[in-house]
Amino acid sequence: MVAAVIVLAVFLAGNRLAPVQFTTISQSEQSSVEDARQVAVRTPEEWKALWKEHAPGQPMPAVDFTKSMVIGVFLGSRNTAGYRVAITGIERDGAIVTVTYREERPAARDILAQVITFPHHLVRVERTVGEVKFARAER
């Protein structure tokens, strides 16, 4: 029993994954970003350019880039309604941040609008200077 507790303590001490809180800025089936991409935006200039591409003519949400950054996933074009992307979790391991996201697809039996959609999810997180990796979660 004592050995098991020691092994668990050593394992947990080496496991530095820490969940990162995030707040949704924008999430819908519509974006003017037509290509699939994942982004980590760290400057006001990058944010202005991305927002202008994503939602031209719409008010740009304020982000304090001295404290925060924006992370986003754009799926690119989909041939019908019913697609969605969701950032489901963000974890930090030292200087590396891993963003997990999931694409939700319509069921074969769903009745769908025949319209091209561009699903996206943009979130605000605490600023980091480390690498940001993206991992697509499988269903």
Regions found by a protein language model. Give the residues of each.
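Exposed, flexible binding/inhibitory loops of compact, secreted disulfide-stabilized domains
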Residues: 2-139
